């Protein structure tokens, strides 16, 4: 039994209808208080509760859920669903794996919530009513729930890959000037950190904006657009769709960080939607992207024709097979050569057709929809 007050009870009564009950309402309420309350005071300690509150992973989850009714609801539903499964298997006391899954799940969800629609100059949802509305959509939509989990996992992976690569700038030193940009500090200035007298002189020059800096001549690969053609034909329904959409959104985030426009082209047997993104997307846009699906046949030529209208490399994600006319193949080759652009194809559960191999600079076949294969894609594109 957990001690709770009138405020805790009021919060629970106000939001309990947002979740699916996998345990009894009373058991679910107790679990909610475990996650929601700032200080958990246990009146009657069972072996199960003792294992939960003393586990390091529970404390990590608490750092996310404490006094946040939305994250507490999400954690409660996930925990209760998994605990029910353990009970049915007679393994109720074996919660180590459950807490491990919960910690990973909450990290993925919070990463998805915070990665989009926030930050300076972008629309963010700090209004509790709006956040509760988004949480309710997440809890009632299993497809969206799975999508946000995969997206959060891939997002952290993509950002890590991006941060690793930007340590090695894609330019060259071409001139020296005076300035306070410590990132572009000339290597000869580093010796001044070792000697006290030289360090004092460096501080003086820093105050006067006079340390030696180098300018970077940016590589052309940082210019132009980044175009992603995403197949949403009937055969992409299910896990393929979730995996591919998560990849596409992660590539969007990295593209915008590089100050590239991100062009999204959704297609099946025709081009269904083209959107141009120049700033971070809102959470409503994420929900819309996660929900949209078309389900028709497959046509490669139409989306590729649209993609060539933009100025940048093209990523083509599909699980289908479709031939491209010889005339169009020649056009693509000419455009690639003239504009110095590349086409990357990601083929899910199918080998690329002859025509797709012909137009692609790199073709990757994905047989398993896992984090490992996602990393393979990020290695190629980030």
From Swiss-Prot:
InterPro entries: VWF_A, vWFA_dom_sf. It comes from the Archaea. One of its GO terms (cellular component) is cytosol. This is Uncharacterized protein MJ0077. It comes from Methanocaldococcus jannaschii (strain ATCC 43067 / DSM 2661 / JAL-1 / JCM 10045 / NBRC 100440) (Methanococcus jannaschii). The lineage of its organism: Archaea, Methanobacteriati, Methanobacteriota, Methanomada group, Methanococci.
